[in-house]
């Protein structure tokens, strides 16, 4: 059974909304984990702060570059690239033996998240019928607004559970 064009749009939209929410979540999860991460890697607060700063910096640089990618790759390829970078970045973070590798993983995550943000808006504005664009953007806004608010809670729970 194959999905209709409308069904594929909804599935794609849901995947990208979830990816954007996870991108926002990982940005704020680190805030409550920073002290533990600094202690684990033996770095001071000014060095440890790079984990949050580099994420925002890489995200900010990536967003404008997505137009270039979108003109050269299919939407599907761009979404897979974003999800792949985000996933690989997360794996690198979990397995990071050194602080530098952890920072590199955060950059990969941020680039993946940075790709999803404009793609989400593009899907909402071009793949949905004219009357549903606002609803699609509203759904995206709810997810994007909710995720950063629970990030510190999740980060705190992770630190309490695993140190």
What are these regions (language model features)?
Residues 1-163:
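Transmembrane-helix bundle of Major Facilitator Superfamily
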């Amino acid at each position: 059974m194959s999905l209709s064009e409308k069904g594929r749009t909804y599935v794609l939209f849901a995947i990208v909304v979830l990816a954007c929410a996870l991108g926002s979540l990982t940005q704020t999860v680190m805030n409550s984990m920073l002290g533990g991460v600094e202690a684990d890697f033996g770095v001071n607060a000014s060095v440890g702060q790079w984990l949050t700063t580099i994420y925002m910096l890489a995200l900010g640089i990536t967003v404008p570059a997505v137009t270039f990618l979108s003109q050269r790759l299919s939407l599907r390829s761009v979404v897979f690239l974003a999800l792949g970078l985000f996933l690989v970045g997360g794996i690198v973070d979990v397995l990071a033996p050194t602080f530098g590798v952890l920072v590199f993983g955060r950059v990969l995550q941020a680039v993946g998240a940075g790709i999803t943000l404009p793609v989400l808006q593009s899907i909402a504005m071009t793949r949905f019928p004219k009357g549903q664009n606002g609803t699609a953007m509203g759904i995206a806004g709810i997810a994007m607004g909710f995720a950063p608010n629970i990030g510190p809670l999740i980060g705190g729970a992770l630190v309490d559970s695993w140190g």
